Amino acid sequence: MNTTTCTHKDNPNFWIFGLFFFLYFFIMATCFPFLPIWLSDIIGLNKTHTGIVFSCISLSAIAFQPVLGVISDKLGLKKHLLWIISVLLFLFAPFFLYVFAPLLKTNIWLGALSGGLYIGFVFSAGSGAIEAYIERVSRNSAFEYGKARMFGCLGWGLCASTGGILFGIDPSYVFWMGSAAALLLMLLLVVAKPKPNQTAQVMNALGANQPQITAKKVFNLFRQRRMWMFILYVIGVACVYDVFDQQFATFFKTFFATPQEGTRAFGFATTAGEICNAIIMFCSPWIINRIGAKNTLLIAGLIMATRIIGSSFATTAVEVIALKMLHALEVPFLLVGAFKYITGVFDTRLSATIYLIGFQFAKQSAAIFLSAFAGNMYDRIGFQETYLMLGCFVLAITVVSAFTLSSRQEIAAAAGAAALTSQSR
């Protein structure tokens, strides 16, 4: 008996939460791509102060991420957390225009702290909570999470081009567009009726779904060289790249005759990149299964180094747009490669913990310091000289990671050797 024939086409939860992804990432795209431009051109912050704002966002993210993770697990399929995030997103425009902006102009630290708390909660930490919730719904409602997640790429891409046009007319329109989209988010939550899977309910009652994880096993992770080498890659490559990308929009628009023209071009380039991102995201598992997770991470590192170093030598708008498009290759290879690496090298029962601590937490923690450092360097020596330093560092860590990251074959060989040693005793 086939129970999954009409899994997606006739599954209301697939379409409801696919649209939820679309709208949520649409709203997120009213913030992040244009935030550095808004901070510099509208608020008048220098690059050092912009770096402080991004550092506060990272600090808030690492504070909220584990808390929201625990709350999300306890709530299960209850929509309480999604309602809180959606209501806060409805206040997106009022907060930015009437709280965040005045505070930034009055006191950079108060403004950065308030913006960091808000953006860190609804976006940096909230996105993980939403993704975890919808992934749970997908398992209970029998649809593929990855296919629903692709709606998010389309939402981000659509908003990037629309927002780029509106930003040139009146930046406040972009924020009000985000608040309006939040109303549709709340409407989706009203009609969404995720139901627990009956089999899962029985298994939970029997205790069969309880993870066999202890605090000792978690702490033992940090005694493993493999864990620290993975964290080295995450901080030295992925984190540095994120810091580079934070203020890239400000650098990008300097290649155009007017800031408005540059903002519009950045929006269109982001849209094209997100469409390519969605296509490559769909194909990336097929590629990664053939080349292996370690090689995928190394390729991602080379792509990131190429974009950063290339940006330091860019002299025309065409060159900087082409370099921007490399982001569409990097994102799928890094995200899918990281998950494949974690599940292939470490105990799969600890995969969520490793991803939270070794990837998200490590990256956000390092970004607190690197964002402020990069912002200061932009002011002191300029974008391109700083990019050359960052790019060479990323390239160096990628080369080192070729020798320090583990492959599945190396893990299997080590396990086999350990088994033979045990038998010989």
UniProtKB/Swiss-Prot annotation:
Cytoplasmic compartment segments: 1-13, 72-80, 129-149, 193-227, 289-297, 347-353, 407-425
Cellular localisation: Cell inner membrane
Effect of residue 367 to V: No change in transport activity
GO molecular function: lactose binding; lactose:proton symporter activity
Keyword Methyltransferase assigned: no
Assigned keywords, A-Z: Cell inner membrane, Cell membrane, Membrane, Sugar transport, Transmembrane, Transmembrane helix, Transport
Residue ranges, Periplasmic side: 35-50, 102-107, 171, 249-267, 319-325, 375-385
Membrane topology of this protein: Multi-pass membrane protein
Transmembrane segments: 14-34, 51-71, 81-101, 108-128, 150-170, 172-192, 228-248, 268-288, 298-318, 326-346, 354-374, 386-406
Gene Ontology terms: cellular component: plasma membrane
Family statement drawn from the similarity comment of this UniProt entry: Belongs to the major facilitator superfamily. Oligosaccharide:H(+) symporter (OHS) (TC 2.A.1.5) family.
PANTHER family, A to Z: 3-PHENYLPROPIONIC ACID TRANSPORTER-RELATED, BLL5896 PROTEIN
Record's function text: Responsible for transport of melibiose into the cell, with the concomitant import of a proton (symport system). Can also transport lactose, and has weak activity with maltose. Cannot transport the analog methyl-1-thio-beta,D-galactopyranoside (TMG).
The protein, known as: Melibiose permease
Species: Enterobacter cloacae subsp. cloacae (strain ATCC 13047 / DSM 30054 / NBRC 13535 / NCTC 10005 / WDCM 00083 / NCDC 279-56)
Top-level taxonomy: Bacteria, Pseudomonadati, Pseudomonadota, Gammaproteobacteria, Enterobacterales
